[in-house]
Swiss-Prot record:
InterPro entries in UniProt: UPF0412_YaaI
Species name: Escherichia coli O7:K1 (strain IAI39 / ExPEC)
Family indicated by similarity: Belongs to the UPF0412 family.
Gene: yaaI
Presence of the UniProt keyword Signal in the record: yes
UniProt KW keywords: Signal
Signal peptide from the UniProt entry: 1-23
Protein name, as recorded: UPF0412 protein YaaI
Keyword Signal: yes
Superkingdom classification of source: Bacteria
Length: 134
């Protein structure tokens, strides 16, 4: 009876350690300052090409309005993918996950992400934080 209890306790502890040891793969890819006037050439270049399966956008400071976004992959043909993003993000808000690499080609790595948009309702520049998940 004692050995059954010991075995059960050991399994429970190992399960807890197993689950707490797993780290999420969310990484802050970068932050972009959004100008007050509409701009279509805001780019976040990743210094190290990395596989990113989805991203989240957060308005860290100020409200912002987005009119487009695209992901560029390191490939022989400079492949890219347009992203379906919300048109407005309020300060402190985070979007749902936005999937990229939709063709299931997980070998492609992201070299840059571009945005079109601007700050709204503020005299200061809003900041857009990009979080990636691999």
């Amino acid at each position: 009876m004692k050995s059954v209890f010991t075995l059960s306790a050991s399994l429970a502890i190992s399960l807890l350690l197993c689950c707490t040891a797993q780290a999420n793969n969310h990484k802050i890819l970068g932050v972009i300052a959004m100008p007050r006037n509409e701009t279509n050439d805001l780019a976040l270049k990743l210094p190290v090409c990395r596989i990113v399966k989805r991203i989240q956008l957060t308005a860290d400071h100020g409200d912002l309005q987005l009119s487009g976004a695209a992901v560029y992959f390191k490939a022989a043909r400079s492949a890219s993918q347009s992203l379906n993003i919300p048109s407005e993000i309020k300060e402190g808000q985070t979007t749902d996950w936005i999937n990229i690499n939709s063709d299931n080609d997980n070998k492609r790595c992201v070299s840059k992400i571009t945005f079109s948009g601007h700050t709204v309702n503020s005299s200061d520049m809003a900041t857009l934080k990009i979080i990636g998940d691999d």
